[in-house]
Amino acid sequence: MGRRRQVSDQQISIAAREVFLDRGPKAPVAMVAKKLGVSTATLFQRTGSKQQLMLMALQPEVTAITELDRGIQLDVPVREQLARILVELNDYLGMLIGGSITLRAAQIEAELPDPTPSKCRALLADWLTAASAAMLLRVADAITTADVLIGTLESRHIHAYMQQVQLSSKQHRDYIRAMLDVVFPAFG
């Protein structure tokens, strides 16, 4: 019978993500091990290499389209639906952007996970088209609107990363609601 794991893969991912996003790709694995209360050897035994640890930690584990997959919900206000969709996309894009920048700085090539930002844009455009067809929302150009909404979220994450600023979930939610009021003034 093998020894019980001291820490889960999820705990390793979270700790490594925090260390590498905060300290950059040159942060030693020993910092992650210390944060977890395990030895560096234990981490290498579990992940194989620093590169594998970084890949494990810096690629999103969740999908960005759970809310989009629900489709249009006639019993939920459209502003609420769109806000939930954008909060979910924002969380996903934040992980993807921070992770991608850090992996690139470490010269680690990694494929973008599915859904890619382009696919997220296309799915959001489809949702906006459906909301417009159901007369829940006025959208002149769903593709451009999706690009504006997602592009704004991406740029906010890039700016926060470059300024080394951590934004809270509440700050993101408040920003998304304010952005919706600007893009769709009829909501306000």
Q: What residues fall within each predicted segment?
A:
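Basic, helix-initiating cap at the start of DNA-binding domains
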Residues: M1-K35, A41, Q51-L55, E67
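Amphipathic alpha-helical segments used for helix-helix packing
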Residues: Q52-L58, N90-E111, I158-M162
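Hydrophobic alpha-helical connector segments
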Residues: E67-M95, T145-L149, I176
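Amphipathic alpha-helical packing segments from all-alpha helical-bundle domains
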Residues: M95, E109-A134, I143-D147, I158, ...
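Amphipathic, non-transmembrane alpha-helical scaffold segments
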Residues: R5, D9, L58, P113-R121
